[in-house]
């Protein structure tokens, strides 16, 4: 990639229909883990106008009121009025869970290559990434896209912008100069709203646009990056019909929003609703942990990690490090340090990151990475000093 370029990432709010589905799936996972953290969970959710469908595979000793968990999640998000297309009090909730296949369970319970360890719950490849563009070691476009929709929800819930409704999307186009963030070229923010905020079906009131720019966008974005920035606020105009009424929502459809905004590859596996025996989730978290510690240690300005697994096998098929020329030691040497300092077998990941806890609903909106939440152990840099010393820095 050239040193001077534009790069764009997007995010969506907790009221976006796909994120409603993700949050219900992870709320159900948490409710199960509160009683039985050894459960096997693959909870999928569909949301539509006035309807929630819960399906997937769950093996557990927990007794959970799945319908109530779904309703509570919808209420917390803010869908408490039939005018919004779904109302937690009156929506229909269908429960269609099966148990995990015994054929899968036998390979997960006892790895074929190490019977004292658990095997991977499926084959697949996962990526982790970190860079020095923000203090959180995340790419700037996705980091700030998340913060925009997070602030939209905050101002909606605390009543400062009472005309906002739950569904919203953001997009940040960053201008890079010499490979580093220089300024923000364009910000797009589309938010659901009360009907009285549009002048015509294709034009919003000037006061609405001003409130979005002054109360949501400018307080979030660094002032030094706002140089001739374009602001596109509800560019198609009226956005009253939204959430599950505007679009059917499904678990796992926002995998780029959930990760790095397109700044690195994605293996294709979604996170929400999956217990950590599923390496789609746990190994992606571990790969972020590894990459972040490498950058925090000063071994590279940016770092991409790929790991891959075979179902029922504990050891990863590969651990590949790519620093795009920013590493201070060879990538192959960094990969050796990864193998030395990080146990990337499924059971090792679960122990290393303490993943058998009800911590997942919080991950299901505003990004799984780059958030300094105490439960997000994969964001810690506890191995940075050891890596730096081992590299001789």
UniProtKB/Swiss-Prot annotation:
Protein family membership: Belongs to the AdoMet synthase family.
Describe which pathway this protein belongs to, using the record's wording: Amino-acid biosynthesis; S-adenosyl-L-methionine biosynthesis; S-adenosyl-L-methionine from L-methionine: step 1/1
Q: Which cofactor does it need?
A: Mg(2+); K(+)
Instruction: For the region Flexible loop, give the residue spans.
Output: 100-110
Q: Which Pfam families match?
A: S-AdoMet_synt_C, S-AdoMet_synt_M, S-AdoMet_synt_N
User: What keywords are assigned to this protein?
Assistant: ATP-binding, Cytoplasm, Magnesium, Metal-binding, Nucleotide-binding, One-carbon metabolism, Potassium, Transferase
From the Swiss-Prot or TrEMBL record, state where the protein is found.
Answer: Cytoplasm
| Record-level GO BP terms | one-carbon metabolic process; S-adenosylmethionine biosynthetic process
What is the organism of origin for this protein?
Variovorax paradoxus (strain S110)
Q: How does it assemble?
A: Homotetramer; dimer of dimers.
PANTHER family from the entry?
S-ADENOSYLMETHIONINE SYNTHETASE (PTHR11964)
What are the GO MF terms of this UniProt record?
ATP binding; magnesium ion binding; methionine adenosyltransferase activity
Tell me the cofactor note: Binds 2 divalent ions per subunit. Binds 1 potassium ion per subunit.
Q: What does this protein do?
A: Catalyzes the formation of S-adenosylmethionine (AdoMet) from methionine and ATP. The overall synthetic reaction is composed of two sequential steps, AdoMet formation and the subsequent tripolyphosphate hydrolysis which occurs prior to release of AdoMet from the enzyme.
Query: Which top-level enzyme class is recorded in the Swiss-Prot or TrEMBL entry?
Result: transferase
Which CDD domains does this one have? S-AdoMet_synt (cd18079)
Q: Which taxonomic lineage is given here?
A: Bacteria, Pseudomonadati, Pseudomonadota, Betaproteobacteria, Burkholderiales
Residues engaged in binding K(+): 44
GO cellular component terms, semicolon-separated: cytoplasm
Detail which positions bind L-methionine.
Answer: 57, 100, 247, 278
Which InterPro entries does this entry report, sorted A to Z? ADOMET_SYNTHASE_CS, S-AdoMet_synt_C, S-AdoMet_synt_central, S-AdoMet_synt_N, S-AdoMet_synthetase, S-AdoMet_synthetase_sfam
Report if keyword Nucleotide-binding is assigned: yes
| Protein name, per record | S-adenosylmethionine synthase
Question: What reaction does this catalyse?
Answer: L-methionine + ATP + H2O = S-adenosyl-L-methionine + phosphate + diphosphate
The catalytic activity of this protein is classed by the Enzyme Commission as: 2.5.1.6
- Annotated ATP binding sites: 16, 167-169, 238-239, 247, 253-254, 270, 274
């Amino acid at each position: 990639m050239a040193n001077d370029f534009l790069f764009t990432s997007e995010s969506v709010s907790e009221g976006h229909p796909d994120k409603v589905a993700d949050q219900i799936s992870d709320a159900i996972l948490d409710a199960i883990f509160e009683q039985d953290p050894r459960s096997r969970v693959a909870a999928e959710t569909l949301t539509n106008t006035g309807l929630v469908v819960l399906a997937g595979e769950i093996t557990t000793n927990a007794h959970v009121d799945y319908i109530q968990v779904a309703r509570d999640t919808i209420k917390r998000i803010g869908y408490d009025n039939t005018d919004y297309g779904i109302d937690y009090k009156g929506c229909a909730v269908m429960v269609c869970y099966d148990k995990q296949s015994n054929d899968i369970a036998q390979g997960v319970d006892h790895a074929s290559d190490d019977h004292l360890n658990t095997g991977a719950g499926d084959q697949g490849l996962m990526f982790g990434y970190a860079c020095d563009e923000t203090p959180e070691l995340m790419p700037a476009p996705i980091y700030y896209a998340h913060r925009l929709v997070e602030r939209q929800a905050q101002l909606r819930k605390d009543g400062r912008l009472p005309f906002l409704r739950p569904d919203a999307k953001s997009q940040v186009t960053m201008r890079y100069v010499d490979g580093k963030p220089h300024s923000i070229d364009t910000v797009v923010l589309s938010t659901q709203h009360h009907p009285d905020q549009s002048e015509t079906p294709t034009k919003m009131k000037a006061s609405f646009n001003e409130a979005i720019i002054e109360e949501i966008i400018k307080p979030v974005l660094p002032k030094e990056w706002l140089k001739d920035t374009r602001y596109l606020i509800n560019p198609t105009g009226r956005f009253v019909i939204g959430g599950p009424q505007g679009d059917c929502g499904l678990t796992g459809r926002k995998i780029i929003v959930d990760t790095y905004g397109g700044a690195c590859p994605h293996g294709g596996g979604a996170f929400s609703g999956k217990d950590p025996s599923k390496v789609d989730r746990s190994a992606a978290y571990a790969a972020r942990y590894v990459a972040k510690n490498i950058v925090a240690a000063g071994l590279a300005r940016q770092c991409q990690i790929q790991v891959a697994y075979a179902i029922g096998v504990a050891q990863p098929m590969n651990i590949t490090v790519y620093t795009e020329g920013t590493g201070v030691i060879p990538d192959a040497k960094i990969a050796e340090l990864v193998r030395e300092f990080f146990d990337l077998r499924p059971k090792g990941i679960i122990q290393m990151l303490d993943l058998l806890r009800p911590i997942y609903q919080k991950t299901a909106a505003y990004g799984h990475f780059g958030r300094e939440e105490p439960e997000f152990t994969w964001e810690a840099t506890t191995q940075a000093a050891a890596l730096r010393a081992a590299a001789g820095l």
